[in-house]
């Protein structure tokens, strides 16, 4: 089963992905994690990626696809994967279709987490990130157990440039312009479920699981209340 957890910046994709990969026992393929690995390693690719992210721009398709295709070639993806934050453009979606088709696979289900823009900005503004593992926190919505330290590895948390309010709005604008058309691509394949992303983490998680269960029972392209 190949799932894609889809939604705007600040919609909670990463939080829900952490649960879903364990629940379904499939690896998570996150472009964010892959990019952070390149940045941490100090590779030329990582330097290029960092420049785009610091400006609030999307990483170009050719760079993203190179990293993703390499990951899909790993043995642990044969049972299926959970795409988190990918694909983000129609070109990426079409390229992913071709890559998966060459492996006799496909994207089986797209979960679209919907959140109002102003709520997204509120969630993103002030968000803190662990530079070591990539886990995110929020002083009010999801605070760490220890002040400004990662719960997982104790690393000091930082505020990324792309999580400042002005950059957050720009990222959302870029998303609306370039990423929403991906939904139309997958709706043509009848694999999309819309999920309300407002409310608590557990509440949203329940809606996502309900959507996946609905797909298994043959329901699709229906809002999940």
Where are these regions (language model features)?
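Glycine-rich phosphate-binding loop of ATP-dependent small-molecule kinases
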Residues: 1-225
């Amino acid at each position: 089963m190949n799932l894609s957890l889809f939604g705007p910046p600040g919609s909670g994709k990463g939080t829900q992905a952490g649960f879903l990969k364990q629940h379904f026992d499939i690896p998570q393929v996150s472009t964010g994690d892959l990019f952070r690995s390149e940045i941490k390693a100090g590779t030329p690719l990582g330097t290029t990626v960092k420049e785009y992210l610091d400006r609030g721009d999307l990483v170009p398709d050719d760079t993203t696809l190179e990293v993703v295709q390499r990951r899909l070639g790993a043995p642990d993806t044969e049972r299926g994967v959970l795409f988190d934050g990918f694909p983000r453009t129609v070109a990426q979606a079409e390229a992913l279709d071709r890559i998966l088709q060459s492996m006799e696979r496909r994207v089986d289900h797209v979960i679209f987490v919907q959140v109002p823009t102003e709520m997204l900005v509120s969630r993103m503004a002030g968000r803190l990130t662990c530079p070591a593992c990539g886990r995110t926190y929020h002083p009010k919505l999801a605070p760490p157990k220890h002040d400004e330290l990662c719960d997982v590895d104790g690393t000091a948390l930082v505020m990324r440039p792309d999580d400042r309010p002005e950059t957050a709005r720009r990222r959302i604008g870029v998303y609306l312009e370039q990423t929403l058309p991906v939904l139309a691509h997958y709706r043509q394949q009848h694999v999309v479920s819309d999920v309300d992303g407002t409310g608590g983490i557990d509440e949203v998680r329940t809606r996502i699981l309900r959507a996946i269960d609905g797909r298994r029972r043959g329901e699709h392209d229906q809002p999940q209340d």
